[in-house]
Amino acid sequence: MQEGQNRKTSSLSILAIAGVEPYQEKPGEEYMNEAQLAHFRRILEAWRNQLRDEVDRTVTHMQDEAANFPDPVDRAAQEEEFSLELRNRDRERKLIKKIEKTLKKVEDEDFGYCESCGVEIGIRRLEARPTADLCIDCKTLAEIREKQMAG
C-alpha cells in the first residue's frame, strides 16, 4: 500500500515534494518574475527527481524479484506485473521529458504563456499542472475539438 501512495502525483503532493507553499502573488507584481520562475523551477526539479527515483526503484525491484518460476501461472503473473510496471515507467519517462522541456522554457524565460494565444496561463493553473502549455480557454477548445473528432 505504501508504494501505491508514493505514486500519487497530484498538484498538492507535487508542491509538498518540492517543499514549497503555493505562491502568494503580491499586488502589482509582474507575471513570471524571477521569484515566480524560481518557484516553478523548484517544483519541476523536485517532480523530475521524484519520478527518476521511481524509475530507479522499479529497476531495482525487477532485478530483485526476477525469478524463473517453474509454475507457468506464477511466471505469467510475474510477467504481467513487470509489464504493468514497465508501462507505468514508460509514461513517467515521457512525463520526465515534458518536465525537462518545461524547465528549458523556465530557463529561457518563456514559461507561463499559452503556446496557442500567448496569454498568461496563470499561477494557480501552473501550480496544479506545472507542465501546462495552454491557457484554460485554449485547452478547453482543444478538448472539445478532440471530442468532436473522436465522436
From Swiss-Prot:
Coiled coil region boundaries: 33-54
InterPro entries tied to this protein: DksA_N, DksA_RNA_pol-bd, DnaK_N, Znf_C4-type_bac, Znf_DskA_TraR, Znf_DskA_TraR_CS
Zinc finger intervals, dksA C4-type: 114-138
Subunit details: Interacts directly with the RNA polymerase.
Miscellaneous field: Dosage-dependent suppressor of a dnaK deletion mutation. It suppressed not only the temperature-sensitive growth but also the filamentous phenotype of the dnaK deletion strain, while the defect of lambda growth is not suppressed.
The family this protein is said to belong to: Belongs to the DksA family.
Protein name: RNA polymerase-binding transcription factor DksA
Native source species: Escherichia coli (strain K12)
Species lineage: Bacteria, Pseudomonadati, Pseudomonadota, Gammaproteobacteria, Enterobacterales
Gene (UniProt): dksA
